[in-house]
UniProtKB/Swiss-Prot annotation:
Gene this protein is translated from: gpmA
EC number: 5.4.2.11
Site, Transition state stabilizer: residue positions: 182
Binding site for substrate: 8-15, 21-22, 60, 87-90, 98, 114-115, 183-184
EC class: isomerase
Residues annotated as signal peptide: none
Family as reported in the entry's similarity comment: Belongs to the phosphoglycerate mutase family. BPG-dependent PGAM subfamily.
Reaction catalysed by this enzyme: (2R)-2-phosphoglycerate = (2R)-3-phosphoglycerate
Keywords: Gluconeogenesis, Glycolysis, Isomerase
UniProt-listed Pfam families: His_Phos_1
Protein name per the record: 2,3-bisphosphoglycerate-dependent phosphoglycerate mutase
Any one Gene Ontology BP term: gluconeogenesis
Function summary: Catalyzes the interconversion of 2-phosphoglycerate and 3-phosphoglycerate.
């Protein structure tokens, strides 16, 4: 039976500081390391044999993957990384304190940017964009693929092709797959898997460092889901 494990990275240093993070590359906090370690322990305690793992290009997700596989004694399995699993790009909000953003733009506007399905935050500057384009992780990408900012809908548009072309292929082969990613890239996968409405998906809360297991049919229909 195919099994999918979705796990948002452990708390990051910027999560702890209440900052918009998006594509900014920050480390796990001490709490985040503990969460990721505990996630791996839960995988081991539940005797789950992972066949393959997928993660983003951002350190907090990469490190979470490492801790999960290390603590579950499965460091040797293949791990595939893609920018398509990165967090939603928060554009010009990245690096801002969320409370300060509410004071500057108004609480209602910030809520719309954070929780609407198809509204993008303000775009990043050209200088910020050029820094991403120069990053070795992204400098091979067509510039047209690099976002200035993203809505949740935009995030889904880039995540689902990766699901279809890569992740789902291992599940269709009956394997157990770990996806260690981010709040919004995981929301995109949940929306697709469960056919969640645009209105409802924005209210889904994704816990940090908590493995969410999906048991699937051979056709990848959801049979059951539960947190470890």
């Amino acid at each position: 039976m195919p099994k999918l494990i979705l796990c948002r990275h452990g708390q990051s240093e910027w999560n702890a500081k209440n900052l918009f993070t998006g594509w900014e590359d920050v480390n796990l906090s001490e709490q985040g390391i503990n969460e990721a370690t505990r996630a791996g322990e839960k995988v081991r305690e539940n005797n789950i044999d992972i066949d393959v793992a997928f993660t983003s290009l951002l350190t907090r997700a990469l490190d979470t993957t490492h801790y999960i596989l290390t603590e579950s004694k499965q460091q040797w399995i293949p791990v595939y990384k893609s920018w398509r699993l990165n967090e939603r790009h928060y554009g010009g909000l990245q690096g801002l304190n969320k409370d300060d953003a509410r004071k500057e733009f108004g609480e209602e506007q910030v809520h719309i940017w954070r929780r609407s399905y198809d509204v993008k935050p303000p775009a990043e500057t050209e200088e910020q964009r050029e820094a991403y384009l120069a990053d070795r992780r992204y400098n091979h990408l067509d510039k047209r693929m690099m976002p200035y900012s993203e809505s949740l809908k935009d995030t889904l548009v880039r995540v689902i092709p990766f699901w279809t072309d890569h992740i789902s292929q291992y599940l269709l082969d009956g394997q157990t797959v770990l996806v260690s990613a981010h709040g919004n890239s995981i929301r995109a996968l949940i929306k697709y898997l469960e056919d969640v409405s645009d209105e409802d998906i924005i209210n889904y809360e994704i816990k940090t460092g908590a493995p969410l297991v999906y048991e699937l049919t051979d056709d990848l229909e959801v049979i059951d889901k539960y947190y470890l």
